[in-house]
Amino acid sequence: MNKRRVFFGFFMLIFFCRALFCYDGVMAGQNNIKIARTEYFDIIYAPGSEKSAEVLYENADGIFTELSNLFGLLHTFRLPVVISPSQDEFNAYYSSAPFSHIVMYDTVPPESFAVFSETLLSTFCHELIHAVTYNLHNNFWTAVKKIGGDAYNPALLTITSGWAEGASVSVESSGGEGRLNSEYHKQLVRQAKIEGKFPRFSEVQGARDVYPSGQLSYYFGGAFSAFLQQKYGMEKYARFWYKCVNFQTLTYFGCFKKVYGFPIQDAWEEFYDSVEVPDVSCDPAEEDWCAALTAGGKNGNLKNVSLVCASEEGAAFYDADSASVKYACFGRGKTGGSFEEGALSRAKTVCTQNDVSRLNISSGGELLAVSYTSLSGRVPKNKIRIINTKTRRSFTLKESGIRDGTVFFADGKWYLAAVKTHSQYCTLNLYSLTEGKNGSVKKAVLVRQKKFGFGKGVFSPSGSSSGRVFYILKDGMEYTIRAFSALQDETEWTVPLPEKDMVIQTVNVRAGADGTERLAFSFTRPGTIPRLALLSADISGRKADFSLSTRDSSGGIFSPSCVSGKKYVYSAHFFESNAIFTADLQKMTFETYSVRISEFAPGLQNAAALSAVSPLPQAVSSGTQADSPFPEFSSASKPFSPAKYAFSGPHGTFVPFALTQSYVIKKSADALEAVLVPFGISYITGTPWTYPLFGFSAGFNPLTESAALLAGIYGGTPQTELLSYYALLQVEFDLDGYKQAYGALNVSSKIALGGRTYLSFLQNAQIFEGRQGLIEIPENSEKFFGALKSDDETHRVLFTDRTSAGLGTIKKSGKGFYDYSGVELSAVYMQNWCACVSEPSYEYDGYQNIGLDFTAKNSALLPLFAEVFLFPSKSYFLGALAECVFLTKEIQKSTVKMPFLYANRFTLSGYYMGKFTHGWRTYMDSWSVLDTADYMRYLCEGDFYYYDEACLSASFMLTPNIGGLSRPAFRFELKAQFFYRQHPDPDQNHYSASICGITVF
């Protein structure tokens, strides 16, 4: 084999990967990216985000100046801001690695996050607050960053996510908008106090890894920061941040005491006292108008349900823990319950779907629209599937970018109305549905389209059998209820809200027998918990009557649906879970208001000439006509080159050690061992949207008397599991010249096929060529320099590859941390090839085989895990593993005396593992899978060696509650294990024990 050809081919493969994935991450699939520079920002945007980029171009510098003055920023800085319309899931983030940058997902926020009049600018402000607060550095740390890079930030050692998000949420809400001025978002803090589960200050810093997990940092951190700013002033709050980010104290609680003069727990108690809650029972079922809704069967308790919708025939609900959409009919089930008694028949799973955002059922319960976020592509995309509740057959619209679907039957036809989003624009789409023979939907055709201006939000459309579609329109901070007819002319109607400060969510409509439309939705006034609102709309009479409930209840009222003239079903949100209840209107008290319905005809666009997959307009004014970009912005926009940007200017981080290693082939000739070549320097850079990351390293080791150069790339699709990859090349030299070269390529992918089923792929390839050193210093060696050098000048080549492909259904199946269910079957192709290049007459070692791996998980009684593998390596031909979690105790606590440590859970588990070999310490031949029948015969005849191991383990899962480590992604597991081996390996004992710590990140 020609080694030059081998390495040239491997280099071209890595180069091809770099070119192929240059636009991965949030810019996946984007071309013609542009950049517009302001005084402080590089605004980088993709086609489709021109208007959003223009808005930032005009306002970003002013927001930065305002925040700099607020926090007393000493040293200004320049920051890239990336705007991408690729994905439909609203979000944004700031990161200082490998250099400071902000990434914004340019899409309309969901209904639950409609808390700003100008969402784009307010979201940018939120992330810019992170950038400003994390960079409140003095002269010393500013100089360190200029030399080493933005990642040298001591705030990462002191500031937790509770403080980081607290600063952003509190400041974004200081102007009267934002989450702290939304009663829906204040609900979590109030609910914790109502239930007596108010957490300590050390328990909201980001370490909690069960629901409500990450929400605590935003809501409790934001409310606490706002409390400090309002009571003790912004100057002290900014000084606290300044001391933390300049590492003037080791911990945030030590810094707090220095700045404020008293312990943080005292301030937290004051904050607790300041939280106002209504005088209600923690259990809403104690109210005379409320009853818990249950379903028949063993799992009839509906306490972990996040979404609900109901018709006159039944109710559908979503269990996010098991990703199951379930449906149950009203009336007498196997338990003898009826709806009047607050019960459903036995619930059946109609589909399995992750990340469901809304459920909407037709008035007769025949069809169910499931709006969800698909993670099967490069970026998250909003999709809608329609399910027949009787046959469970489903139809998924090919179009993406659509959400908040509602399905209804009118004038002999089925229709679907949905909101399509692109950048900061909404379009209300109406589809005509065609049924198949079995009653399921087989086709959807776009028939009408209503366009809205930049920044206007359209939420929760709901269609009735009258043919009218009602929806919520948010313009700035003003809410109205709108309606249009799917059957008649282009007339639209507007129903104004009776009070200016009302905020509403989740409209559900049913047509009344008297020709009126009856709507149910939740609403808030300033200072209230979400309540029930009813609307009777007489379109022909141009009159609407509101009935607003007057009392708060624990958990609030979310997603109410009418099931009869007297009863409504709704979801209540508690601190640690959600539950479904029924409300009896006859026992509730309401305030009534009457308003006039206005009629207008703006012109719904008939879609006869439209295609369901045609792109939406990308620059639409507040009316309906396209705007030309601002002249100054157009002239400032230039073509953008990711490679040029990454490798020019201070766009990376220097690390004062090397990432290089010196490799040695193991005696088994099928793998490599490594010795660090640590003394040197590394440089890490990437695109302004983080991925891909590029790394370069140069290192030296005096023990090997060698130096190495390394280049690598890491990237993929971080929002989904479609692709993850890394590739690297390394060359090592010593005093004799070229020593060795090493290359590695790792690619993994998981492709969702629908429901629980997925395909998984994994490849891990390595290639080595050259001379080797030593792994350990010889006992008789007296020298330091060159102690790991070898006299063996033989050049060898090693190539290893392990490629697997699997089909599986393993998914989360319950609320428990270890609750997973499903199976997976994988086929693994293994090969390794080792040869002596300097002496071609030597025979080479090679091995190829195919193995099978079957995995099963179930958590019906206890979390169980079982795995059987056939030919997993060349050492043994059959193995099995069974593991059980006997006990899991959720702790989720941190003490006042030890706030730097968060206890997640205690686990007691055990496993049994066994493996069969044919011959003691012998290796199997290539393609031994073809001799499976012979190996099975050896097994039956007892002609094998058997080794086993049983283990009982007790572990505490802990999270460091300091700095950037205070997050579920970084955990420390303290584990005590006892081993028993009936048939031990020759180098093992029958009994052993160990205490160890395992870091997981």
PLM regions: where:
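Juxtacatalytic substrate-recognition/specificity segment
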Residues: 23-154, 160
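Beta/coil-rich, acidic/histidine-enriched accessory regions frequently appended to metallopeptidases
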Residues: 24-25, 32-37, 61, 212-215, ...
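Acidic/His/Gly-enriched intrinsically disordered linker/tail segments
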Residues: 25-29, 97-99, 116-123, 131, ...
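A flexible loop/linker signature enriched in serine peptidases of the S9 family
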Residues: 181, 319-326, 351-355, 371-384, ...
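Outer-membrane beta-barrel initiation region
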Residues: 284, 579, 584-717, 813-815, ...
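Repeated scaffold domains used in trafficking and secretory/extracellular systems
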Residues: 303-308, 355-361, 401-408, 454-462, ...
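Conserved blade-ending motifs and adjacent loop-strand segments that build the rim/top face
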Residues: 496-505, 545-561, 594-602
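C-terminal transmembrane beta-barrel domains of outer membrane proteins
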Residues: 668-684, 695-717, 725-728, 740-746, ...
